[in-house]
Amino acid sequence: LTYLFLEAADGAQTTQPAISFRYNKKIDRETFRRALKLTQKGLGQPAFFNDDINIPRVLANGCNDIREARDYAIEGCVEAQVPGKTDFRPVAGFINILKVLELTMFNGVDPKTGRQFGPKTGTMEEMDTMEKFMDAYKAQLSYIIDYHLKAYGICSALHSQICPTVFASTLVDGCIEKGRILQKDGAKYSSTGTFISGVANAADSLAAIDQVVFRQKLLTLPELVEILANNYEGHEEWHQMLLN
């Protein structure tokens, strides 16, 4: 049956619907080679998922039955879930970790609004090592994640009242037995995902700070913050150096 799906996908030559291919050490080699051949067409089909990684992941995510974990399927983009028994919500929100870096550099203050949005993790004058700066960044990130979770909890509670998923709840195990809809923990399992944005930009920025401030000592952190606060006005040479 797997081989037939791969043949059909090869014949259709479309990027949707997305096909997931579960891989394990006992997989039939001919079928695996057929999946690889389809991948060579450049359509991004199929997506490969390793059972040795995903089964333990499902168990760690709350599943307490190894048989159900072995029966996992892919929902959303790459999330392994127990089909028919999970309330999976693919997008709980976004966290911009580059913005978190900006909050770190301004001691928790959002420079755009002037509001004290994050915790006070220390002024730049106090950050005399990259380790101290990273500790402050991690503290800001931890606070923002907690803030995000609280906001998501409020939104989820409101959704259960304003837009209850009654019909969908009849299709997922646990809801009828408990007399609860999905949004009120009716399903046997529940999980969601949060998108992290700005990862590459934040990594590049941290690398630039480490190199220019702490390794080469070309600028101090207070000087860098001052330059950033003025959007590099009169300091284009620093702009180019930090970019490169």
Predicted ranges, named:
Residues 1-244:
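Conserved catalytic cores of very large enzyme subunits
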